[in-house]
Amino acid sequence: MQIRFTKMQGAGNDFVVLDETQGRLGLTPAQYRYLADRHFGVGADQILTVRPSPAEGIDFEYVIHNADGGEVEQCGNGARCFARYVRDKGLTDRDTIRVQTLAGVIAPRLTPDGRVTVDMGRPRFDPAEVPFDASGLAPAARGAGQTWPLALGAGADAQVVDVAVVSMGNPHAVQLVGDVDAAPVAHTGPLIEGHARFPQRVNAGYLQIEDRARVRLRVYERGAGETLACGTGACAAVAAGIRLGLLDARVDVRTRGGLLTIAWSGDPSESVFMTGPATTVFEGQIDIPDAP
């Protein structure tokens, strides 16, 4: 099976973008995994699919598959690339589009400087909405927020980390670290991602605060491992930091792949806004194995 694709990246978070506006490709999880494979396929953190929307007032459907082939609710860096793609391909002439995701409707906006701002919706901190099983745990209050003790491992190797849990349409667990470069992401990231208290698994964020307007962040993404950047992870980390009284309303987030700017008023009823780059890397076509 031969398909055309566009390779894009936003702050180093890289994507294969597929156009299904003229018909479904009908790919299987195994075929998504093949596309994402960096040795045999194109290579990507996620596969993004553009589909027409049947709903009035919605321009497109935005479908996201992780590198493991599983469909997920949201991807912030991908949303910026999605908006850049549909505009560059002439699928819309609008600067602001309304896009349906599994997590709800988002509204990416192309800015005059070439970046893209996305209304990512409001953050949710209720453990049940993340979802996070908080039964039997005592939270530690700080500012208007709270952190939860999360036990990792068992026996002599067990450790407890304090995490703020946030949903940005997908689940996040954010922990504060003194030095993000020294954070044990490769070791504890998988333990947090698959922790039994997160029934849908979770994205694990490691947040270093430099001052009230600047942070550094690494994220071990659910179904993808550590990536160079995670847009929803940046939104979740900043929202958690503001909620805990540690950050101001506008924060520059330095990831290993580049800079994102996150803005949130601190009002739980209001949206988080993310601004960052979206770049086309190359286009091509690839033969992928037919579905069994």
UniProtKB/Swiss-Prot annotation:
Concerning Pfam families, the annotation shows:
DAP_epimerase (PF01678)
Give the EC number.
5.1.1.7
InterPro entries, per database record: DAP_epimerase_AS, DAP_epimerase_DapF
Keyword Cytoplasm among record annotations: yes
> Which GO BP terms sit in this record?
lysine biosynthetic process via diaminopimelate
Q: According to its UniProt record, where is this protein located?
A: Cytoplasm
> Which GO MF terms does the UniProt record name?
diaminopimelate epimerase activity
Keywords, ordered alphabetically: Amino-acid biosynthesis, Cytoplasm, Isomerase, Lysine biosynthesis
Q: What is its main location?
A: cytoplasm
Its UniProt pathway annotation is: Amino-acid biosynthesis; L-lysine biosynthesis via DAP pathway; DL-2,6-diaminopimelate from LL-2,6-diaminopimelate: step 1/1
Main EC class of this protein?
isomerase
Catalytic reaction equation(s): (2S,6S)-2,6-diaminopimelate = meso-2,6-diaminopimelate
Q: Which GO terms describe its cellular component?
A: cytosol
Q: Where is this site: Could be important to modulate the pK values of the two catalytic cysteine residues?
A: 172, 221
* Superkingdom as given in the UniProt entry: Bacteria
* Similarity section: Belongs to the diaminopimelate epimerase family.
Known role? Catalyzes the stereoinversion of LL-2,6-diaminopimelate (L,L-DAP) to meso-diaminopimelate (meso-DAP), a precursor of L-lysine and an essential component of the bacterial peptidoglycan.
Note the subunit structure. Homodimer.
PANTHER family per the UniProt record, alphabetical: DIAMINOPIMELATE EPIMERASE, DIAMINOPIMELATE EPIMERASE, CHLOROPLASTIC
Q: What is this protein called?
A: Diaminopimelate epimerase
Recall the taxonomic lineage recorded for the source organism: Bacteria, Pseudomonadati, Pseudomonadota, Betaproteobacteria, Burkholderiales
